[in-house]
């Protein structure tokens, strides 16, 4: 909404881009901790700043080699106004294994489709998805565990009758 928001235009600066980049780094680090192996996250911005787009993806891949950028062009119609991310936009040099993945990201230009323009990357954490425990199965175990616990307490503890005789 940059073009339509005068405050955003006035607040824009190279320093603000770096502040936003740091924020994006923190968001991706948090997302990584929550994602299981085999899981997918979509990173998306509404900025054209390469520092928050291609470069943040390259930085993330460099720091998280257990991720890969998935190519999603096969899911998109031809000539839909989307373009691949550009390695020429990177702010520093990266390893070839990272450079090969940047074209799998997407740029959505406002002059090619309706909207303000965006950037997106589909990131998959390598590995197999592990089963999530079935909570219903866990609940079924609880009554038996409770019964075992009560049996242990009844066998192991002596209940005093003093309260009963004192109140009589």
Predicted regions and their residues:
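C-terminal catalytic and target-recognition region of SAM-dependent MTase-like enzymes
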Residues: 42-167
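Mobile active-site "lid"/loop adjacent to the S-adenosyl-L-methionine
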Residues: 1-29, 35, 47-54, 63-67, ...
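Low-complexity, flexible helical/coil segments
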Residues: 24-32, 76-83
């Amino acid at each position: 909404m940059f073009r339509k928001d005068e405050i955003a235009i006035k607040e824009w600066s190279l320093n603000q881009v770096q502040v936003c980049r740091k924020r994006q780094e923190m968001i991706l680090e948090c997302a990584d901790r929550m994602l299981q192996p085999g899981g997918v996250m979509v990173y998306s911005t509404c900025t054209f700043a390469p520092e928050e787009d291609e470069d943040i993806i390259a930085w993330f891949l460099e720091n998280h080699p257990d991720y890969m950028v998935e190519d999603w062009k096969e899911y998109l119609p031809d000539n839909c106004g989307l373009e691949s991310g550009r390695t020429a936009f990177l702010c520093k040099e990266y390893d070839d294994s990272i450079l090969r993945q940047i074209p799998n990201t997407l740029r959505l230009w406002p002059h090619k489709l309706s909207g303000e323009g965006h950037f997106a990357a589909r990131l998959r954490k390598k590995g197999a998805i592990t089963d999530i425990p079935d909570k219903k199965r866990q609940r079924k175990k609880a009554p038996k565990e409770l019964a075992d616990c009560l049996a242990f307490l009844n066998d192991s503890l002596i209940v005093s009758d003093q309260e009963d005789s004192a109140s009589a």
